[in-house]
Amino acid sequence: MSGKWISALLLLQISFCFKSGNCGKVLVWPMEYSHWMNIKIILEELVQKGHEVTVLRPSAFVFLDPKETSDLKFVTFPTSFSSHDLENFFTRFVNVWTYELPRDTCLSYFLYLQDTIDEYSDYCLTVCKEAVSNKQFMTKLQESKFDVVFSDAIGPCGELIAELLQIPFLYSLRFSPGYTIEQYIGGVLFPPSYVPMIFSGLAGQMTFIERVHNMICMLYFDFWFQTFREKKWDPFYSKTLGRPTTLAEIMGKAEMWLIRSYWDLEFPHPISPNVDYIGGLHCKPAKPLPKDIEDFVQSSGEHGVVVFSLGSMVRNMTEEKANIIAWALAQIPQKVLWRFDGKKPPTLGPNTRLYKWLPQNDLLGHPKTKAFVTHGGANGIYEAIHHGIPMIGIPLFAEQHDNIAHMVAKGAAVEVNFRTMSKSDLLNALEEVIDNPFYKKNAMWLSTIHHDQPTKPLDRAVFWIEFVMRHKGAKHLRSLGHNLPWYQYHSLDVIGFLLSCVAVTVVLALKCFLFVYRFFVKKEKKTKNE
């Protein structure tokens, strides 16, 4: 009997191969934390379709643990960093952004972050150098005959490995600062007149002053990106490939861009055919809760429950903040499930339970859930959108301020400032979102939009990877603008030529006019003299 089942599974896997073409070999250059959580879902689906997936992993890692999944093949290469060093860096990064950075404009706080961003760039550059300079490691990759490289664009190197292996590659990306990578490499347009820049904190229809702010942010990040790549990355790529090149030129060869967002969160803007928005690909129907959690949820009666989580990267909330939150939660009639890994606050109410981990998606999909208190991470926001749950946003770092600003603009959330938050601020926000049907109505509207797609985001992501493998690329979808220098892309040479033509025409017309004028004036004077 077991032999028949094994044969059936093998036949099923073979059928997947025939359905999508030949089973391929996918090489992956991933990133940590939520980046890995999202990309892993795509990789596991590829394995289910019969493809062989190999994940490149530095010896220093936080989330890239082979023990968590047996379906993926991991290849580890040595690095000079330790996992402890890496975790300390990310913890320091989160703490600086959460507690220290000014929040006035993107210019003020990003200047403070410059050293941290440079440190992250140096880490990525060192890891990349250690990977591509490892001859044994690169020879092994060459001999494996991979069909495609799937990389996270926020951590450069996957495209360099693809170039060295001479195979196509495609990107997964949530965002880059100021959308610089998407704009100048991916060819995605973000007109600052109506599209709020990431890290600007703006959303929706902008006023004149907000458009000025948005334009300044765009110009700043444009300049920042140029200096970011020109200082170290461009010389390294040129040296490695043995020819003059740039990071932007190599990244621009990406066949497809799979952006981990969607139009229920984003605001509309032009995109190219080789860009697809796959936000919420990790969302699934809610599963039954563990018995102890289900019993607690059911004990809430008609009032329902509130789910509270500020993510996996926040671990050292101050005692003062914890007490403010606990007191506010204690005042509402709902039961509260709070993901919190710290000392129990003295003000914690009997309606609130602390958990080091929560089945967040399953709780958000429970019919008794009334609201979700979130830091604004994209994964949590998409789970809330998926299940139609209104939010109280307490953004902490990175793009979370923008995510919550977008949800506020769409009427599905209320924002609370983490640094200045008082007991009454949080309590008022909770009562507003729970008691006002306006927020639930808009959350359900976004949920309807999210579910009403021709194909599921995960299926589209897998399709495009298989598409690139089947056709050895997708160059017919790439904009020809990738082949143009910046002055041609913006038609500055054409504008200059047309202006020159106008100028020459005007000059010739003036000269003709002056010639005619002088001719008749002289003739008239001559006639008078006679």
Swiss-Prot record:
Signal peptide segment: 1-23
Annotated EC: 2.4.1.17
Family: Belongs to the UDP-glycosyltransferase family.
Membrane-spanning segments: 494-510
MF GO annotations: glucuronosyltransferase activity
UniProt name for this protein: UDP-glucuronosyltransferase 2B15
Function of the protein: UDP-glucuronosyltransferase (UGT) that catalyzes phase II biotransformation reactions in which lipophilic substrates are conjugated with glucuronic acid to increase the metabolite's water solubility, thereby facilitating excretion into either the urine or bile. Essential for the elimination and detoxification of drugs, xenobiotics and endogenous compounds. Catalyzes the glucuronidation of endogenous steroid hormones such as androgens (testosterone, androsterone) and estrogens (estradiol, epiestradiol, estriol, catechol estrogens).
Post-translational modification: N-glycosylated.
InterPro entries hit by this protein: UDP-glycosyltransferase, UDP_glucos_trans, UDP_glycos_trans_CS
Annotated membrane topology: Single-pass membrane protein
Gene3D superfamilies linked to this entry: Glycogen Phosphorylase B
Natural source organism: Rattus norvegicus
Recorded name of the encoding gene: Ugt2b15
One cellular-component annotation, GO: endoplasmic reticulum membrane
Record field: catalytic activity: glucuronate acceptor + UDP-alpha-D-glucuronate = acceptor beta-D-glucuronoside + UDP + H(+); 17alpha-estradiol + UDP-alpha-D-glucuronate = 17alpha-estradiol 3-O-(beta-D-glucuronate) + UDP + H(+); 16alpha,17alpha-estriol + UDP-alpha-D-glucuronate = 16alpha,17alpha-estriol 3-O-(beta-D-glucuronate) + UDP + H(+); 17beta-hydroxy-5alpha-androstan-3-one + UDP-alpha-D-glucuronate = 5alpha-dihydrotestosterone 17-O-(beta-D-glucuronate) + UDP + H(+)
Intracellular or extracellular location(s): Endoplasmic reticulum membrane
Top enzyme class: transferase
Induction conditions: By phenobarbital.
Tissue distribution: Liver. Lower levels seen in the kidney and testis.
